[in-house]
Design a protein with these regions (language model features):
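An amphipathic, aromatic/His-enriched active-site/gating alpha helix that lines ligand/cofactor pockets
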Residues: 25-37, 53-87
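Active-site-flanking beta-strand signature of metal-NTP-handling nucleotidyl enzymes
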Residues: 3-9, 49-51
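Short, low-order "capping/linker" segments at domain edges
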Residues: 87-95
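Short, surface-exposed ligand-recognition loops at beta-strand->loop->(often short) alpha-helix junctions
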Residues: 9-21
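Non-catalytic surface loops within mature trypsin-like serine protease
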Residues: 11-13, 54-56, 91
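Short, acidic/polar N-cap/turn motifs at the starts of alpha helices
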Residues: 6, 37-38
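A short beta-turn/loop motif at secondary-structure boundaries
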Residues: 40-45
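Short acidic, gly/pro-rich beta-turn/loop elements at beta-sheet edges
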Residues: 17-19, 50, 60-61, 94
Length: 95
């Protein structure tokens, strides 16, 4: 089984390009073994990380994602007090 995750980010305007470059690099790191496919989409002032991964790797890969987020949080605007710096959506991929 595979999981599809879409994570929304809203970089501060002065960090937009730097954040996109950093996210692109992070997604392509070799230790992200569970990733089957990935994309970065931009729309208006938001950046979307779209990742397909093996369900068995979801938990460990999510931990790496949180660690990464902690290094770039200063580049991001908060959406609100609940979601903070990301709006994530993950579910089972129907193939």
């Amino acid at each position: 089984m595979k999981k599809l995750s879409i994570i929304r980010f809203k970089p501060n305007p002065e960090h937009y390009d730097e954040f996109v470059k950093s996210l692109k690099h992070f997604i392509s790191l070799p230790d992200r073994k569970g990733i089957v496919n990935s994309f970065i989409m931009t729309k208006d002032e938001e950046v979307f990380s779209i990742v397909v991964r093996h369900a068995s790797q979801f938990e460990s890969d999510s931990k790496l994602g949180v660690e990464y987020l902690n290094t770039v949080r200063h580049m991001l605007q908060e959406y609100n007090e609940i979601d903070r710096h990301t709006i994530p959506l993950t579910g089972d991929l129907v193939e």
